[in-house]
Amino acid sequence: TSRDYQINYFYEGAVRLEFLLEQISQITHGVVLNRIKPKILSEGAEYPILTISQLIDEENGVWDYEVPTALVDKKKVKNLNLAKEHSIVIGLTSFHRAAVLEKQHEGKIIPSNFVSIEFQNGIMDPYYFAWYFNEHPEIKRQRMIAIQGNSSVKVLSVHMIRQLMIECPNLSTQMSIGKLYY
C-alpha cells in the first residue's frame, strides 16, 4: 500500500480508513515573532500570544495565568496564524502534545514553537484527534523516535506531523472517544 492515499483494510470485520494527516487537514507552522514586529512602534497593533505554559496550566485546572502580548506590524496582521476555536495545536518543543483550542484562545498568535491544524469539515473530530495524537500507542512510538537524538532540545518536525497516518473511524465513534478524553 502507498502512504500517498487512503488505505482500506479489514479489522475485526469492519472497514477502517487511514489518511495522512496532511490529506485531511490544513497544517500551518506558527509565526516567528521577530518577523512580525513593526519597524516603527506606532505602526504596530498588540496581540495576545498562545504559550505552552498556558496549555499546561489549563491541563492542571489553572485559569488565571498572564497572557503575553506581541506588537505586530499592521501590514502583517492579515497573514497571522491566529488561534481559532476547535482547531488543534501541537507543541513542537518540550510540550509534544496536541491540544484543542477553545473560545478563550481565539485571536491569540500561534508562535513558531507550535503547528496548528484545521480539519476539513466532517472528517475529524478535534477532540478525537487530540486523544489519538496524545495517547495512541503507534503515534506515541512515532513521537518518541522523532524526538530522539543528542540535542538537548527535543523537537518534532512539521514534516513528521504531516506524514502521520491517522485512523479515521466514523464521526460518531470519533466524537464518543473525544468526549471521554476531554
Regions picked out by a protein language model, each given a short descriptive name:
Residues 1-46, 168-182:
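Non-catalytic DNA-recognition/assembly elements of restriction-modification systems
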Residues 22-37, 54-85:
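Sequence-specific dsDNA recognition surfaces
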Residues 125-160:
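Short, positively charged
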Residues 92-134:
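A short beta-sheet element
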Residues 75-78, 104, 151:
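A structural connector/turn signal
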Residues 39-47, 67, 81-83, 100-113:
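Short, surface-exposed loop/turn microsegments at beta-strand edges and helix-strand junctions
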Residues 108-115, 148-175:
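A short glycine-rich beta-alpha junction/loop motif
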